[in-house]
Amino acid sequence: IRLYDPTAGEILFDGKDISKIKSKADMQAFRRDVQMIFQDPYASLNPRMKVNDIIAEGIDVNGLAKTPKEREEKVNELLKTVGLNPSHSTRYPHEFSGGQRQRIGIARALAVNPRFIICDEPISALDVSIQAQVVNLLQDLQKEQGLTYLFIAHDLSMVKHISDRIGVMHSGKLLEMGTSDDVYNFGVHPYTESLLSAIPL
């Protein structure tokens, strides 16, 4: 999403190289289509902002609410969508658990109606008891809203559970790619084999 510029290669979205986007309007349109859920739900939410302002940031930037009432309604609906209570909107991030904070991060990503969401290790910082809940929420949202995820993870059992296609990367290089079943059952690269052999039985 151009938080960093690439040093080599291309990143294509809808057939366009995003590293060549120059105008502010084009970048804003791209960022409406592509959102991100960050790994650390503690560091990725501004501790000085209330939840309603965190979630509504994208709504405000893109002019998606015409009145304060419409803004509030959108935020409340997003909170309900991710399993939180609208009354939580006036609280600060420190008042929530890790799992709840990650739900706030998911609501923030959904606020601009994206088509593609990058999930950067979205459950690795959470308690094991909460991880499945967040993954189930992501899967439900995918079905309901027709979302596409790029799910970055090192937990291969979770990757198999959530993925249609898997790409195995090492040192910045894509080693192999295929359907979830193909990579798990017929992965040919030695690095893939070493990852698969490390999964607990």
Predicted regions and their residues:
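A short, proline-enriched helix->beta-strand linker immediately N-terminal to the Walker B motif
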Residues: 111-115
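ABC ATPase "signature
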Residues: 174-178, 186
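ABC ATPase NBD coupling module
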Residues: 18-35, 61, 68, 182-187
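Conserved ABC ATPase signature
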Residues: 92-96, 100
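Conserved ABC ATPase "signature" region
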Residues: 17, 63, 69-87, 196-197
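Hydrophobic anchor residue at the start of the ABC signature
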Residues: 106, 134
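A short, surface-exposed alpha-helical micro-motif characterized by mixed small hydrophobic
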Residues: 159-161
